[in-house]
Amino acid sequence: MNILLNGIAQELRDGAVVAELLMVAGLAEKRVAVEVNLDIVPRSRHATHVLCAGDRVEIVHAIGGG
């Protein structure tokens, strides 16, 4: 299936979950925020949130500061 990841087409297996996408993108151990179709997906749901063809996914890195 195809999704859009930060505006770029990305191919994943059917039934892939957010955690798999993060692994493919090399971000599995990073502090990131994930948004799917304008809804934030909490880290606690990364392993269970199933992606669908055509989903628009945005991933942003958490940056500390003050």
Identify the function of each model-found stretch.
Residues M1-G65:
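Ubiquitin-like/PB1-type beta-grasp interaction modules and other compact soluble beta-rich domains
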